[in-house]
Amino acid sequence: MAASERSIDKEVDMGSSFLQKFRLYETRSSFYMIGRDKNRTSWRVLKLDRTEPAEVNIYEDSTAYTEAECFETLRRIHEGNRSSGGLKFVTTCYGIIGFIRFLGPYYMLIITKRKKLGEICGHTVYGVAKSKIITIPHASVLSNVAYSKDEKRYKRLLCTVDLTKDFFFSYSYHIMHTLQRNLSNNVEGHTYYESMFVWNEYLTRRIRNNVKDCMWTVALVYGFFKQVKLSVSEKNFRLTLISRRSRHYAGTRYLKRGVNEKGRVANDVETEQIVFEEAQDGNPGRISSVVQNRGSIPLFWSQETSRLNIKPDIILSPKDPNFEATRLHFENLGRRYGNPIIILNLIKTREKRPRETILRAEFANAIRFINKGLSKEDRLRPLHWDLHKHSRKKGTNVLAILGRLATYALNLTSIFYCQLTPDLRGEGFQNQNPSTLENDDGECSTYDPPSKDETAPNLVVENGNDSKDAKEDQQKEVTMLQKGVLRTNCIDCLDRTNVAQYAYGLVAFGRQLHALGLTESTNIDLDNPLAEDLMGIYETMGDTLALQYGGSAAHNKIFCERRGQWRAATQSQEFFRTLQRYYSNAYMDAEKQDAINVFLGYFQPQSDKPALWELGSDQHYNAARFLANSVPETSRSTMKRSLSESSIISESSPAALGPVGRHGLAEKDEEVKGLSDSAPEISTSETAKIAASLSAPPPILEELGLDDILENDCFCCDGNGEQCTCAAFDMDWVSSSGNSCEDESCGRATVVRSFETIPESRKIESEICVVETVGSNSRKGNKEEEEAISGIPEGYVRWVMDEDGHFW
């Protein structure tokens, strides 16, 4: 048989294995769901019992019917129930989201309308356009609890999770996994519904425990999906940007901060950028992807939601002196992506009142502490760069500097690229057992440890399949694998982080186009129309993720300036977004957090236990209030919050512990010295010498060997993005004519004082990687800026221009 014929036959077979359209019928005693495949060749029947008031019994008919046989079955059901009203049509639907129970009956959530978002290798990706909640038991058997106020309130709470916004799925492609993972060899494990990115994992547990496969349900991923068609040199290609939000430790801005005991962080989002050339049949021949990650700083910290304070204090807890949760977090990243793990930390280095600087110092301590137990090749690679400060410096091209950092990271991790054969396109592409793609801890893996031969170019990798002939058909040339990941964070992991992720995506975009043979160069200039197209998509993604976690669109000041938008209009936009975020955090987030906890199954109502809205804080009650003495008690307004994950029902899959690198982490019990008030100050003459040393032309970042970086454990960049060695101190703490301080009254001692309340065992000398630029300061802007905003009230302008404004 010719290869093309095998491909056609395979597509028919695969189209028959996925149910994509359903019709729901009801009798007095049962629901009947009829599902069919895309090709209308296979019809299946699912039965749900309606006679139990507080239970749901699901039965799957294993017979694959033809269309005629299916309608004959329905006719017989109708005849058998004629005395009680017969069989009635309820609705058409496109998949079951899941089942949920509060205090009374079970409910079924279904998709009643879908919208096409794009395609990956011929596999359609859909969004939810409309959904419906259906009560399972018949009205005649419902108890009074089903009509109680609490039951109705829980139901309304569930409905506040808008499934029509930012939820997406695919019948035939594992959208919860990265492209590299989907094309890697299969490994045994749990079903793909237990992925950290499948938000209806809890809702589908009951049906997955009752039926043999998951053809009746869809795996919903929450985040962002955007696909566009672009062209370069008259060559067409598709760009797809996917963000997957983790369901672990999920929630809203002030109610979910930092890390939990399992090493899971708030606002954990995986972003994948896929580029493929568009062949004549619309399917890709060559395809490339790159993955990056964002997530809250993995320490135990929190902020009190306040209606009186728009910028609450940061509370750092001393509950984890050995950084065990931080270690667990990076171990998980290592299992998912491999090594190296590059950490781009964008938070502030100097403040009038220490807030972010407290976290910066402690995060540096944690990284240093963890790295002491790792080999050189497996160490975390931290890059600390104050984006807020440098975005205010006149003449500083923030995106260009971030691009050089991205180049450094990509040189370490590379991108994924492969050549697809015709048999791997269309509906036949993903012929994999859905129960073979998970780790034991229920978190999807992107990284497969390569064999010795996998580093060779033009490697042929095979999909796991029982048929030898199928293995020969399903081959692909893999010339590049991504090994490791860039993890970016600021405080909220929204605004500054999104700018940095765009810069990383742009550098990767150039390499992807070059790998696909669409461009001769690997570089894309910031003024290139392709860069503008990509910036628009990342800006939209940033707005979407910010609305989900922060309650407002992202602060896009740098993007607006890049487009040449009128400065006063930008400032006005940023101001109103700050107010919107404040209002959402202060007045809306508590209920939103409750809804998330119910949807994810982190809170399951019980009639003999307090209701969800009667419970207290969702945050760490025992957090050490480092700044409590400096903040009047009247400045805080206590807000009701929902349960934290430490006190909620455990998930089905316990977290598995594993090493960050091949050698694991060694336990370190000995005390390590750190910064204190006795730390030596740097004199003016010493500062001048350091500033002078930066003027010498050092080797560029890309040419410096990794061994040098690991040996020095520290590097910085000058204004040209070039490398220099600076042992064991942070260049952001050095004040000189070329490195201006945002607040002259805020010296290095301010940062040192933030260590005073840290336990002695956690004071570690911050020997970290630092990226710094040298340039002049322009905090207040120039004369043209002042004229542009002359029509705006002075108090508003002063608030906007203040260094503690809330844009960054």
From Swiss-Prot:
Residues 429-476 are annotated as: Disordered. Residues 465-476 have a biased composition (Basic and acidic residues). GO terms for molecular function: phosphatidylinositol-3,5-bisphosphate 5-phosphatase activity. Transmembrane segments: none annotated. The keyword Magnesium does not apply. It is an enzyme of class 3 (hydrolase). GO terms for cellular component: vacuolar membrane. It holds the Pfam family Syja_N. The keyword Hydrolase applies. Its EC number is 3.1.3.-. Ubiquitous with a higher level of expression in young seedlings than in other tissues. It catalyses: a 1,2-diacyl-sn-glycero-3-phospho-(1D-myo-inositol-3,5-bisphosphate) + H2O = a 1,2-diacyl-sn-glycero-3-phospho-(1D-myo-inositol-3-phosphate) + phosphate. InterPro entries: Fig4-like (IPR043573), SAC_dom (IPR002013). It is a peripheral membrane protein. Residues 158-551 form the SAC domain. It is found in: Vacuole membrane. The PI(3,5)P2 regulatory complex regulates both the synthesis and turnover of phosphatidylinositol 3,5-bisphosphate (PtdIns(3,5)P2). Component of the PI(3,5)P2 regulatory complex at least composed of ATG18, SAC/FIG4, FAB1 and VAC14. PANTHER family: PHOSPHOINOSITIDE PHOSPHATASE SAC2, POLYPHOSPHOINOSITIDE PHOSPHATASE. The phosphatase catalytic core motif (or RXNCXDCLDRTN motif) from the SAC domain is found in metal-independent protein phosphatases and inositol polyphosphate phosphatases. This is Phosphoinositide phosphatase SAC2. It comes from Arabidopsis thaliana (Mouse-ear cress). The lineage of its organism: Eukaryota, Viridiplantae, Streptophyta, Embryophyta, Tracheophyta.
